[in-house]
Amino acid sequence: IDLDVVCELNGKRPDWTQKDIKELVGDQLRNHKKYESILDDEGRRCWTLKYRENGNPNERYHMDILPAVNTTGYSIILEKAYSNLKDQSYEDLVLSITDNERIPEYSTSTEPEEWLQSNPFGYAKWFMNIADNIKGQRTKMFSLNESVNPTPKYQSERLPLQRAVQLLKRHRDIMFQDYSEDDKKQKPISCIITTLAAKAYDGEDNIYDALLNIIHKMEDYIEEKYDFSLMKSVKWISNPTNEAENFADRWAIE
């Protein structure tokens, strides 16, 4: 299990850089008695809390906390995020995030508009718009709120695409559970699995057919593009809410 949480700041001091904000969030977690012992080393963009690391491998889970700055206004973000699910306008949901590999701006830039942009709310809206589009079914079963709530109540009823993604992630976790820490870095990240599954999904009304179709077609959505900065062709999986962002950027490095 993994939980993705956005630590959203609705403003900042004018002199704060990405580094300042990232460290501020990290310090708050580090200074909390409950989180100090389970806080992992600083990640590229997130802080991670690891739960039950010494317990049963099947019961371990982690929470990724993404520091972000909202330059639009909190009320506007909420209004846009929870508006009509079929509205495919995502640009107003963009947040500015930290990235400690973007040198030197990570420790120098104080303008959030210049930082790396991310769109977790827009991505959730994109995903649910696809998941809710089941062949032969006109009634909307789920709301966007159920897809972005960080800790929703357990729901036994899920859409076929949601269940298929859960199974694919579980398969990944089991496959890599006995690998070394270095080899575990080769695991496909969750947003890659989710994106490829959603793009391959064709409105199947049951988990079996959905999973079969996704497994058969998901590879077709891995593109190849020429990266001028690396002077070579790289695998490319576009963020559907930001086509310039490559979810598979690590593949080119590794």
Regions found by a protein language model. Name each.
Residues 146-254:
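Conserved nucleotidyltransferase catalytic core and NTase-mimicking acidic/glycine-rich helix/loop elements
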Residues 4, 48-50, 129-133:
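Flexible, surface-exposed loop/gating regions in the mature catalytic domains
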Residues 14-19, 206:
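Short, conserved charged micro-motifs
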Residues 9-13, 53-55, 69-75, 174, ...:
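Short loop/turn segments at secondary-structure transitions that flank enzyme active sites
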Residues 22-27, 82-85, 214-218:
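Amphipathic alpha-helical scaffolding segments
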Residues 1-16, 62-66:
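Catalytic metal-binding acidic patch
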Residues 19-80, 91-118:
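Conserved catalytic core of two-metal-ion nucleotidyltransferases
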